[in-house]
Amino acid sequence: MRLRHVVSSLDLTRDDYFRIFELADKFSNVKKLNYLSGKVVSLAFFEPSTRTAQSFHTAAIKLGADVIGFASEESTSIAKGENLADTIRMLNNYSNCIVMRHKFDGAALFASEISDIPIINAGDGKHEHPTQALIDLYTIYKVFGEIDGRTFGLLGDLKYARTVNSLLRALTRFKPKKVFLISPSQLKVRREILDGLNYPVIETENPYDVIQDIDVLYVTRIQKERFVDEVEYEKVKESYVVDLKLVNMMKKDGIILHPLPRVTEIDRKVDKTTNAKYFYQASLAVPLRMALFYEVLGERKDD
């Protein structure tokens, strides 16, 4: 069954995740295919992006699709006063799928409710980033061969990081042993996210108390652009630094992930450790997003 919109991690079933992982494996060494020949993908990035925009662009091209779009709100008619609904309707006329990033929470859901073509959420405000969660889980699957039964530690900005929200929600499709939420009190996971989880969660402010139990340490930067009050940002901006001291306390086969960009929250000396998998994680973005495009737009025998 073809996927329609991918607005939230909860739009995917457990079977969907594994099917996309299997497809990503098949696409991992592909140079160029024509599966999406004749299709047009719109990259509607109302908010800046480097990795996400470029990896989606590359994924579409490698499947044979044509790509149109924009990289900032300033380059669109929204800068002239056009509303989001009209922009989405216009993009429906030009393309077969819209990959959308926006600064407002819920923008992707709003777009999906008025769009006749699939919407893929590439990040909406501090709400969600479901394709990043797909990459995160795919990395874990590739490293360990499984996701169930693992202990996770999410560290850093757990309040404003949309990648955290999507990963926590995606994990409801699996069976994590437990999840440690490690953050300053000002940056704890929001209650509406916690209330929807179906696995054990433990909140703490000290990573040293739990690091020895963690299989997957997921690190996020403190997101200055989400803070209304810069004074509050200054208080927490360097709350944690993952350094060699912390890494040396991890399990030997434990891994460190990061959605990137990294600022100061992971010491660069950590990059050379066997635990550091964040650059490998980033390398999986293109085949994973190829798989997602194929799920949304590819021809199916059951269509």
Curated annotation (Swiss-Prot):
PANTHER family: ASPARTATE CARBAMOYLTRANSFERASE, ORNITHINE CARBAMOYLTRANSFERASE, MITOCHONDRIAL. Keywords: Pyrimidine biosynthesis, Transferase. Pfam families: OTCace (PF00185), OTCace_N (PF02729). This is Aspartate carbamoyltransferase catalytic subunit. Carbamoyl phosphate binds at R51, T52, R101, H129, Q132, L260, P261. Its EC number is 2.1.3.2. SUPFAM superfamilies: Aspartate/ornithine carbamoyltransferase (SSF53671). GO terms for molecular function: amino acid binding; aspartate carbamoyltransferase activity. Heterooligomer of catalytic and regulatory chains.
